[in-house]
Amino acid sequence: MKIEKIYEDNDIIVVYKPAGIATQTARLTEPDMETMVRNEVKKPVFLIHRLDQPVEGVLLFAKSKEAAAGLEKQLQNGQIEKYYLAVVNGDLEEPVLRLDNYIKKTKENKSVICEKSDKDAKKASLIVKKLADQTNAENKKTLVGIHLLTGRHHQIRVQMSGIGHSLVGDKKYGTIKDNEGALKLCNYCLIFKHPTNNKTITVKYWPEFAKEYINEAPVLDF
């Protein structure tokens, strides 16, 4: 499988991760993005963030330990901006909505919304913006932009399901009726400082599912 490069220089490489491909895997018989990128650049690479296997979109790697350290520091300090595109079930009443919850991971590899006082509870925050909807659809669906403010396990899927707008195709957090093909979730845009020259880097991938709702790639700056 040939990887799709979005950006590359001497210090970093950004690629598109298709839905269904693991970011990393311990199974030798399964393809994963880390191995494919390492084979492409013919040197060790350092994964900066992860995407769940059903999720598509932008994936960032460093080509050296020094570059990785700089990017990981930005990630830990919340300085890497992450914007997602998703299709959710239903119609959002508010054009822009901020969600703040506490969530925790379960033994079944799921996450649930919980109380702040619960053991292992972690703060989860994001901002959702309505972009377009299918007004003639029998079951209304809405394209949204999501600014991910914290990076928790299955965060977007859990929080959107929690307000009654599960992601289309979400077999874990949606209802049986929601199981329509692939999960409609894409890591659309990353904004970060280059680890060597400190210039602002913006990388994007516009997914096919979004093109059914809008004609050009959106500018997400909320």
Residue ranges and their predicted role:
Residues 108, 150, 196-197:
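Residue-level recognition of short loop/turn positions
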Residues 1-12, 18-23, 137, 159-222:
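Pseudouridine synthases involved in rRNA/tRNA modification
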Residues 139-142:
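Trp-centered recognition loops
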Residues 71, 152-160:
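Short beta-strand segments enriched for Tyr within beta-sheet-rich domains
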Residues 1-123, 129-135, 206, 212-219:
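RNA pseudouridine synthases
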Residues 113, 155, 201-202:
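A sequence-level detector of short linear motifs
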